[in-house]
Curated annotation (Swiss-Prot):
GO terms for molecular function: protein-cysteine S-palmitoyltransferase activity; S-acyltransferase activity. This is Protein S-acyltransferase 21. InterPro entries: Palmitoyltrfase_DHHC, PFA4/ZDH16/20/ERF2-like. PANTHER family: PROTEIN S-ACYLTRANSFERASE 21, ZINC FINGER DHHC DOMAIN CONTAINING PROTEIN. Residues 359-372, 404-420 have a biased composition (Polar residues). It catalyses: L-cysteinyl-[protein] + hexadecanoyl-CoA = S-hexadecanoyl-L-cysteinyl-[protein] + CoA. S-acyltransferase involved in protein lipid modification. It is a multi-pass membrane protein. It is an enzyme of class 2 (transferase). The chain crosses the membrane at residues 16-36, 42-62, 192-212, 247-267. It comes from Arabidopsis thaliana (Mouse-ear cress). It is found in: Cell membrane. Pfam families: DHHC (PF01529).
Length: 565
């Protein structure tokens, strides 16, 4: 389930720590820091400045955590609400009902309720961006489809697995806020960092001043401690509390300052944290193996690389079939069950006898190196390279797909599809494969690439017969073997193995004519065809075995004579 905002349970541990430290330092400042400056004027100024900074931090933190940074397209489909109302948590659909089934009635207490809703609305309303309308018009032309959210999102959105939704203008997921930082709350996030930075500076500065006065003006500090805190507190415990709170503020100030200046450089370069991380990973990590290299180096059998399905050569009809790694049809799933059970120690290369082979299979794959925020590396990074790396990462994402891929989820860049199925509206297509590959057209004689739809026009039938006649003229002499496609057996059959089926003979011509006939003509001719009984006999003898092509006696004799001469 997608998270609406950072206040939604469960709360992150870092979020609880951040809230606890904020209230701890605030209480420590008003109780142990400001009253011990030794001057009423300094005390009032310090309390006034600190109160403004602390209140700003509190409001901005509530705002950054409460804003929903999600892409406006992911909740429109789920709630059936308008886009401008989907971001408002107070909007209730017309058909909404209460728990008891009755109509939902909103109760309020008049002016107080209206003021409360106004304050909450001001806290959770998204940031105003001058370039929002221009970016929306550009992103609508290049929208993406999120397969996890099942919705169309904008071009620069990214799916956050921690929040379970796509974030508009994703920058990063902040664990201290328990919320994502995106286009809708990025300005508030930068203001929160600035306010927190100066708030911690004020805390640290006043804490150092009070700690120094504990040793410089001991009598005055002891008098103030007794006056403000009572007799139960002495100077050493007071100094210890001041040191702890001052050190805590310093430990929070250093990483926060680094993060603040890091985002200042990001704004200067015009990139996001996500683009920075992707660019550094592209520089440090080695490039992944391409799909072609995986196919070449794979030594384990699979349906795409087995010797039966990856048949590629020159047919005996003299027609060259050129394709890369494409199987003629999808084979049985005989290797898929064992494809994941690969023993890693059987890979090429020697294995030392002192190493247990079974322990090698238990090794975990290497994890990605965590990219740390570094303003110095960011200053040296080229913004154009970072944008290109982010665009490449979005293009290779398996979650965010182009909108066109939603209409055809099995569409790939290759012309060969591994998921081919017969068309529902064409009965004759069930006996042929609708597989296409480079260099293959309908003019080829191979019946695998020639479909004979039932509603084919007479002109197309005549053209196909002419193609068959033209192919016959290019056939070799009758003493060589010829092969025809048996649609019922699902394989090629040699005509030279059957008496009277030489090319040019009555049975051979009948076989070639049978290939170009439609479904009804094919079944009618097959009843009177002497080859039908032979095909059925071969299939009964073959059983469930895969087809095997055996050389004829003439081919074997010619091959032996060529080797010895």
């Amino acid at each position: 389930m997608a998270r609406r905002h950072g206040w939604q349970l469960p709360a992150h541990t870092f979020q609880v720590v951040a809230i606890t430290v904020f209230f701890l330092l605030t209480v420590a400042y008003y109780a142990f820091f400001a009253p011990f400056l030794g001057n009423k004027l300094y005390e009032y100024i310090a309390i006034g400045v600190y109160s403004f900074l602390a209140f700003s931090v509190l409001v901005l933190y509530i705002r950054c955590t409460g804003i929903d940074p999600a892409d406006p397209g992911i909740f429109v489909k789920a709630d059936n609400t308008p886009a401008h109302k989907s971001q408002n948590s107070n909007y209730v659909p017309e058909n909404a009902s209460a728990i008891d089934g009755g109509p939902y009635i909103r109760h309020g207490s008049g002016c107080c309720s209206a003021i409360g809703r106004f304050i909450c609305g001001c806290l959770v309303i998204q940031d105003c961006r001058r370039d929002t309308q221009q970016e929306q018009s550009n992103e609508q032309e290049e929208a993406l489809f999120c397969s996890l959210c099942n919705a169309e999102v904008r071009m620069f959105s990214k799916h956050c697995r921690s929040c379970g939704k796509c974030v508009d203008g994703f920058d990063h997921h902040c664990r201290w806020l328990n919320n994502c930082v995106g286009q809708k709350n990025y300005i508030s996030f930068v203001c929160l960092m600035a306010a927190s930075f100066f708030w911690l500076i004020a805390e640290f500065g006043v804490g150092v001043t009070v700690f120094v006065r504990c040793f410089v003006d001991q009598k005055a500090m002891e008098h103030l401690i007794t006056e403000k805190l009572g007799l139960g507190f002495s100077r050493p415990p007071f100094a210890a509390v001041v040191v702890v709170c001052t050190t805590l503020s310093l430990l929070a100030l250093i990483p926060l300052g680094e993060l603040f200046f890091f985002h200042m450089i990001l704004i200067r370069k015009g990139i996001t944290t996500y683009e920075y991380v992707v660019a550094l990973r592209a520089q440090t990590e080695p490039l992944g193996t391409s799909v072609d290299e995986l196919d070449q180096t794979s030594q384990y059998p699979s349906p795409a690389s087995s010797a039966v399905t990856a048949t590629s050569a020159r047919s005996s009809l003299g027609l060259s079939i050129q394709y890369r790694g494409a199987s003629l049809c999808t084979p049985p799933n005989i290797f898929v069950d064992q494809q994941d059970d690969v023993i890693q120690h059987l890979e090429p290369g020697p294995v030392r006898s002192t190493i247990d082979p079974d322990s090698l299979s238990q090794k975990k794959p290497p994890q990605r190196q965590q990219v740390r925020i570094n303003p110095w590396k960011l200053a040296k990074l080229d913004s154009k390279e970072a944008s290109k790396a982010a665009a490449k990462a979005r293009a290779s994402s398996s979650v965010l797909l182009p909108v066109s891929s939603r209409q055809n989820p099995y569409k790939t860049s290759s012309n060969v599809s591994g998921r081919s199925s017969p068309g529902r509206g064409k009965p004759a297509d069930s006996e042929s494969c609708s597989l296409s590959s480079p260099g293959l057209t309908r003019d080829h004689f191979n019946p695998m690439y020639m479909s004979s739809p039932a509603n084919e026009s007479p002109l197309n039938e005549e053209e196909s017969r002419n193609a068959v006649v033209a192919a016959r003229r290019n056939l070799p002499s009758s003493d060589e073997s010829s092969v025809v496609w048996d649609p019922e057996a699902g394989r090629f059959v040699s005509l030279s193995r059957i008496p009277g089926t030489d090319v040019g003979g009555p049975l051979g011509n009948e076989c070639l004519n049978t290939i170009t006939s439609t479904g009804t003509d094919r079944s009618r001719r097959a009843r009177g065809n002497p080859l039908t009984g032979y095909f059925q006999q071969v299939r009964s003898q073959r059983g469930d075995q895969l087809p095997v092509f055996m050389p004829t006696d003439s081919q074997l004799h010619r091959h032996l004579s060529t080797r010895f001469h």
